[in-house]
């Protein structure tokens, strides 16, 4: 690990240890070490499409995809009492599988393993409602309901996949929570996202306008590079575990490094 990267890890850990309302924001880049492709990386879905190439192959069968050290690092930050809220653009369910609490998570594009009720907005796993995709399909909003398909256990409303497809409305509750916590944040940590998709790309701007420090951890450029207080271009799995370990050391020592306090 280079001296520069060590300094960046130390700086990020100092700000996180001193923070009162840390918000993390994750994109597809956090899941590449689990075997999923990203979108705008060197071998990403959109990068290959723009070059006239076929989509990238998944590194593992879907049934073998598991949370990686980066997902578990965010769980540790939450359990330390530092990470107050997590915003994610991902639908891969890896944050929940890693043990991150649902009530502190806004999945802006839904979750491929969860269904939700159109009437009361309750969310369920496929198993909780007995949704068999071989019988009922994916359950997207645009699909015609089938006779006898499972209904919401709470209100008997229609349940659909929580995944947001093109043309679907974004989940209002999650969007509202994401903006609220972005505005409250004193450190906004964007991880593995190119920050170009709206309205998610407005959240770091809201955080900056509210006085938060912006940390970017991403391979490749983002529209916020010049505005970030700290930009780390390195592997996510290489950076997050030592950041968390350093945060633990700082919290254990009761130390907030000089100049790393809230502002």
Residue ranges of model-derived segments:
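Conserved catalytic core of sirtuin-type NAD+-dependent deacylases
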Residues: 1-263
């Amino acid at each position: 690990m280079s001296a520069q990267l060590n300094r960046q890890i130390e700086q990020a850990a100092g700000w996180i240890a001193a923070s009162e309302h840390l918000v993390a924001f994750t994109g597809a880049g956090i899941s590449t070490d689990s075997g999923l492709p990203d979108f705008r990386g060197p071998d990403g879905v959109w990068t290959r499409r723009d070059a006239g190439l076929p989509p990238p192959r998944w590194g593992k069968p879907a049934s073998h995809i598991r949370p990686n050290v980066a997902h578990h690092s965010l769980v540790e930050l939450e359990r330390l009492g530092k990470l107050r809220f997590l915003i994610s653009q991902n639908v891969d369910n890896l944050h929940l599988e890693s043990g991150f609490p649902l009530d502190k998570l806004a999945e802006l594009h839904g979750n491929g393993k969860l269904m939700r009720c159109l009437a009361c907005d309750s969310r369920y796993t496929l198993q909780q409602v007995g949704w068999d995709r071989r019988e009922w399909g994916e359950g997207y909003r645009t699909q015609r309901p089938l006779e006898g398909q499972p209904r919401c256990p709470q209100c008997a409303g229609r349940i659909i996949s929580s995944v947001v497809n093109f043309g679907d409305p974004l989940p209002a509750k999650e969007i509202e929570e994401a903006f609220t916590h972005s505005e409250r944040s004193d450190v906004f940590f964007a991880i593995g996202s190119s920050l170009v998709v709206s309205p998610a790309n407005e959240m770091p701007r809201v955080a900056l306008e509210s006085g938060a420090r912006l940390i970017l951890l991403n391979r490749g450029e983002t529209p916020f590079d010049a505005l970030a207080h700290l930009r780390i271009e390195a592997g996510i799995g290489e950076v997050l575990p030592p950041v968390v370990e350093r945060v633990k050391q700082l919290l254990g020592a009761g130390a907030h490094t000089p100049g790393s306090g809230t502002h």
